[in-house]
Amino acid sequence: MKKQIIFLLLFFTSCSNNNISSSTITSITSSNENTSSISNEITSIKSENSSQSTSITKPKLRIYLNPSVQTKNMYTGYKISESDTMNIVAKKAYDLLKKDNRFIVYINDSLKPLKESVNEINSLDIDYHLALHTNAGGGSGSEVYYYENTSSYLAKHSLESFNKYHTFPTRGIKKNNNFYELKNSKAKNKALIEFLFHDKINEANFIINNYDLLATSVYETFINIFNEQ
């Protein structure tokens, strides 16, 4: 009888221990699963944050359009001046650029003389200063002037964008350190485009009949520059 009692005591003790062990194991397993889940969530968050931190926002381009103020340079066959046509083109280009949130754009739309417009440019921390002109003197075609080597980039893009739209000669980009606004502007990049020769009737006709096209070429100049940043 004594042996039977001892056996029963051992049997119940064993069962009790087994229940505790099973409960403990279940708790530990559950804890491990929760820990793993939390760890996965943290990894996911880190991954998302890492992805966000690698996205780069390009800075907006600060642009100043400075159309010709030469009111006495008259177009062959027309009662219209270089200043008239270039202000029309500049305003159209301004409207295109203004609608595009990649750009902050300014314009001399009140015929400010060169000294005043250059002073304004120098107060605005401008990235790209583009002067808009047409040419005279018996030549033909398009050309762009730049100051020193730092602005050949703007000159190159301006000429390439415009040359897509006409079949007149291309006269290339040229360094010129004597133009007042190029010499005195503190913009990071500065250039002066001579679209075509207004003393050639066929080129004067082209300019007057294609204001929107000239404005589009200016707009595309800065799109291309922005995309290359």
PLM region spans:
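Sec-dependent signal peptide recognition
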Residues: 2-8
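C-terminal motif of bacterial Sec signal peptides marking the signal peptidase cleavage site
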Residues: 13-14
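N-terminal, intrinsically disordered, polar/charged segments of Gram-positive cell-envelope systems
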Residues: 19-62
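Active-site histidine-acidic residue metal-binding/catalytic motifs
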Residues: 45-118, 124
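Solvent-exposed loop/turn segments at secondary-structure junctions
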Residues: 69-72, 110-115, 134-139, 149-152, ...
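A short, glycine/acidic-enriched catalytic loop
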Residues: 73-81, 135-157, 161-162
